[in-house]
Each structure stands twice: as C-alpha cells, then as structure tokens.
Amino acid sequence: PISIHKLTPIQMPHVDIEEVREGRKAFTQEEWMDVMLRSCGYEPEQLNNREKWLLLARMLPLVENNFNLCELGPRSTGKSHIYKEISPNSILVSGGQTTVANLFYNMGRKTVGLVGLWDCVAFDEVAGIKFKDKDGIQIMKDYMASGSFARGKEEKAASASMVFVGNINQSVDVLLKTSSLFDPFPPEMGTDTAFLDRLHCYIPGWEIPKFRPEHFTNDYGFITDYLAEFIRELRKEQYGDALDKYFRLGKNLNQRDTIAVRKIVGGYVKLLYPDGEFTKEQIEEILVFALEMRRRVKEQLKKLGGMEFYDVNFSYIDLDTFEEKFVSVPEQGGGKLIPDGICNPGQVYTVSQGKSGMIGVFRLESQMLPGNGKFERTGLGSDRDCKESTNTAFNFLKANGNRISGSISTTMRDYIINYQDLQGIGMTGKLALPTLIALCSIALGRP
C-alpha cells in the first residue's frame, strides 16, 4: 500500500501577509531587493544598483492598481518576461491586434474583457497594436485615466494595470534628435499627447543589459506562486502618501504628474518595505527615481505638444530644510540648464524674455568654416525679429571686427549659429549681443 508521510503544498491556498512583514524585518534593503530580483529569475550580483532599480520597476504594475507603464528598449532585455512567466495574474497580449470586446466589454455576451479578469494586461511589441474598432484608443484613454469605461448603457470599473513594451530600432541619441522616445508606438498612439500623458512611468530599456546566461540566478528566492500571491495581496494597500511626512512635490508637477509619482512611490514602498518601515533617506531615493520616470514621459510630451507641457523641471522640497532639489533624466544631459564649468568656443547661454512673456534660457552654438563671409542661422524658423537682431550683430562684426581683434575675418570664413529654446517658451528677439559674443568666441577660438 502507498502511504503519504508528509505533503508540502506547492501552490498556496492563501497567503499570510503578516508572515511576509515579519520576515522582511530580518533583511536589509539591499538583501531584500536581491531576494525579490532572484524570485524573478535575475542574478543581482551581475547588476549594478541602477539596473536593479529598473528591473524592480517592471513589477510596479503587479503591486499597484491601474498603473500605466511603458518600457521601450533593445531586444533580448527580458521586457515581457515578468508579465508572462512570473505572475499567473497577468496576461501578455502578443500580436497586437485586439478588439474593444476582448479588452473591455463584450456587449453581445454581456461579459467583461481582459481588464476585468487580470491584474495586469501587457501588450508585447507596441508597434503592432491595432484596434479593429475606431473608438478603441478613446476607450483605452478613458480607462487609463479613471479606471472605468462606458459601453452601451453601462459604466464598468476595473483595476488592471496597462503595460506597453516594445523595441527601439535606433540609438536613443538619434531618437532624441529626430523624433521622440515614443517613436515605436503606432502613429495614432505615439503622437497623441492625451494618450501618452496617461502613462505614469517610462522605464529606459536601453539602460538594462542584454541578458546572458550569467544574468540568470541559481540562488534562492520566493517560489513563484508565493511571490505572485503576496504581490497581489499588496494591491489592496496604499503607500502613495508615504512621501508627505518628509517631502513636498515642486510646483512644476500638475495633477497627473502628482498621481504618477505617488503611484510609483507607493509601488516601490510595497515591494521594498512591505512592513511599512522606512527612513527619510530611503523614501528620498524612491522619490528621486519616481520623479525621473515620470519626467521622461513629460519631456517627450513637451517635444510633441510644445507649450502645453513646458513645466518639466520636476523638483521636491525637503520639509526640514525647505531646500528644493531638481531631478533630471540622464539621456537629456545634466540636471542644470546651464552646465558647470567653461563652455566650448562659440557656445553662449542667454537669459531673456521669450515670445510667451516668460523668462527663459536660450543656447547658441556656433561653427566656423572656410568660405566667403556667409552667415547662416538655424532654429529661428520664420521669426522676423530674431533674424533682424542676429543680422544686426553680424553687420556690427563686419564693420568693427578689426577693432575687436585683428584675427577676426568676416570675408574668408562662413559662420553658422544654431539657436535653441531650452524651456519651450518661444524664441526671444533679444539676440544681438549673445550672437555677437558667440561670433567673436568662435572666430577667436576662445570660450
């Protein structure tokens, strides 16, 4: 006869969240982060701190309700792995083509679609997303903003998070110069600022390494069923106000930005501090990361939507010292509009009143080539005032160049200046003096 001496259930019938909270107290933050990453199959020993934070961000839609996340990056960085393999509560929609009935509500059968059945709906290969119904994207926008949607006579609410993952085919530098970081999206989504503004977080997939065998762990982590169950249990809790004890968000964040940042902060607190115990420094680390992830969305909206999204200088204020700290995105350069140190020859920054009446920073970058005295300007468009003030500067240099320096030539050289409006407030017409300084600087080869 067969007798069973001991039976260990592999699948969890229920999860004791208090057990997780008590267990968390035995770990440091770094150790707990490593356990969470190993539970997902990653080997943290092969990753730097930044990469760990980015990989952990992929789990945010699993712990937060109605969280909208986007990750675009190179191939073979494991973008869709978590949503397909780690949680049985998330579904990966491959192939792109879908219908409103499948995703939201089937009016014929009176059944709720994927958003009502799963905790997280992830779309693989965003470039191929296509709705058979014309109103598909409009309903998706409504759902992403409010967590509810109307079909027929009824309004339905759901809590599923939306994830969009896809491949970037060019380098980030090229994308930033030629289009936007949302370029891989289909045109009806990638140029719709109302849709993109609903994304809470943009993970820079190009910073995550391509996975090799050594990136996968052989070490211990939580069994997948246990991880998925306690992550699902954490969706019921809210930690979005965790930052209010120590910090206040800056004035440049509107309501959507604030909601996004609070959701990211709340998600990270659930993942890293499920016991609810954290220090000011730990919450600041999360807050800086959250502001960066949302600012990346806002920077691209500014490129696509112009003046409407000029407020991208995200900051937070320390409630103890009242010091305001600004947060930048790495791919856009440093956190300051005017960098520290000496500029290159021909590079000039000027502060002036823009077209909108707001004070802003403008950058001039110059180039000098052998030629016959031509003066070319880029970045001014058809603005007459700007062109007149730059012509005034060049004419002054032609008339008085020898008095400034004998080595300045306006007949044997061509000059090109590119003008940039760094804050999107409209180009200033007061460019005569900065243009003259830039021309002299490049002509003499001196900063």
Protein language model features and the residues they cover:
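Conserved ASCE/P-loop NTPase catalytic core
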Residues: 43-175, 179-183, 194-197, 315-332
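Phosphate-sensing "switch" segment of ASCE/P-loop ATPases
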Residues: 155-162, 167-272
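Conserved nucleotide-binding/hydrolysis micro-motifs of P-loop NTPases
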Residues: 77, 127-129, 162-172, 206-210, ...
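Helical mechanochemical/support elements of P-loop NTPase systems and associated helical scaffolds
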Residues: 28, 32, 132, 136, ...
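Terminal-proximal interaction/regulatory segments of ATP-powered molecular machines
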Residues: 303-447
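Conserved, well-folded catalytic cores of nucleic-acid-processing
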Residues: 39-43, 129, 143-147, 168, ...
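Charged, amphipathic alpha-helical linker segments immediately N-terminal to NTP-binding catalytic cores
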Residues: 2-47
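C-terminal helical "lid" subdomain and adjoining coupling/linker elements of P-loop NTPases
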Residues: 213-215, 241-316, 322, 326-340, ...
